């Protein structure tokens, strides 16, 4: 019988088992700050890898998009069906300053609106605000029974649908092009555009559940820190007080204390 190495017997690895590194050890938490149009300003936290060499942490945070329920932003559970998108525009200290970047409805809310015996009317339009944001607004509406109507159905005719759609586009364009993005977001929250459409189209056919169901930002202007600070209103970061000193004023030379001398 030949004597030799038994290859089946496994050798122990050199150095033993490697200790698993904690993935959070090299990351930092940053606070997400919502614009001043919302009631709740501190909306959450986000993680980012620490600055290492040329890879700067703040650059990794910029243009990150957060989706938050309007119920959390307004502290109002009745607004839970709206989802607001906020985009990180600037980082100051440990705070991420965001701006509005779109809006959508939850799927369950949209499904609950669609019912039998009524007509669904949709319209969308591209608008440009006074501060050069290009948005696409999507509107949804449903017909309802007229006063004292006995008939079960409330279907609108094709000509009426076209008229209503034209009116929707007209109102959305007028209300969006006459204000900046901050003012427009203020109109989205209480659904003032939907109410205006409902009022204007009542002579054509009575409508119910009129909503701006979706907002997409197609084009944003060049980043301006001054405009962002206006959006955040009362936000202030803890910074040192600037000292004014004349150029010709001599600087007093004090004695430098050496620690451990």
Curated annotation (Swiss-Prot):
PROSITE patterns recorded: RIBOSOMAL_S3AE (PS01191)
GO cellular component, one term: cytosolic small ribosomal subunit
Positions with biased composition (Basic residues): 1-18
Signal peptide start and end residues: none
Keywords: Cytoplasm, Ribonucleoprotein, Ribosomal protein
Transmembrane segments: none
Keyword Transmembrane helix applies: no
GO molecular function, one term: structural constituent of ribosome
SMART domains: Ribosomal_S3Ae
One Pfam family matching this protein: Ribosomal_S3Ae
Name of the protein this chain belongs to: Small ribosomal subunit protein eS1z
Native organism: Vitis vinifera
């Amino acid at each position: 019988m030949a004597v030799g190495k038994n290859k089946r017997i496994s050798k122990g690895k050199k150095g033993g088992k490697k200790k698993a590194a904690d993935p959070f050890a090299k990351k930092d938490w940053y606070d997400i700050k919502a614009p001043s149009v919302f009631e709740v300003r501190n909306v959450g936290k986000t993680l980012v890898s620490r600055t290492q060499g040329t890879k700067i942490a703040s650059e990794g945070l910029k243009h990150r998009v957060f989706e938050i329920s309007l119920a959390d932003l307004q502290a109002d559970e009745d607004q839970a069906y709206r989802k607001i998108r906020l985009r990180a525009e600037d980082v100051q200290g440990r705070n991420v300053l965001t701006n509005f970047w779109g809006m959508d409805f939850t799927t369950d809310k949209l499904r609950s609106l669609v019912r039998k015996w009524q007509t669904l009317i949709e319209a969308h339009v591209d608008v440009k605000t006074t501060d050069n944001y290009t948005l696409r607004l999507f509107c949804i509406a449903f017909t309802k029974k007229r006063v004292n109507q006995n008939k079960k159905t409330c279907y609108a005719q094709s000509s009426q649908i076209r008229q209503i759609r034209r009116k929707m586009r007209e109102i959305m364009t007028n209300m969006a092009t006459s204000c900046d993005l901050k003012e427009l977001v203020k109109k989205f929250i209480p659904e003032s555009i939907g109410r205006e459409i409902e009022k204007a189209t009542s002579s054509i056919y009575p409508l119910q559940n009129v909503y701006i169901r979706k907002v997409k930002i197609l084009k944003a202007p060049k980043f301006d820190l001054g405009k962002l600070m206006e959006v955040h209103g009362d936000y202030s970061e803890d910074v040192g007080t600037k000292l004014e000193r004349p150029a010709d004023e001599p600087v007093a030379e004090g004695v430098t204390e050496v620690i451990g001398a």
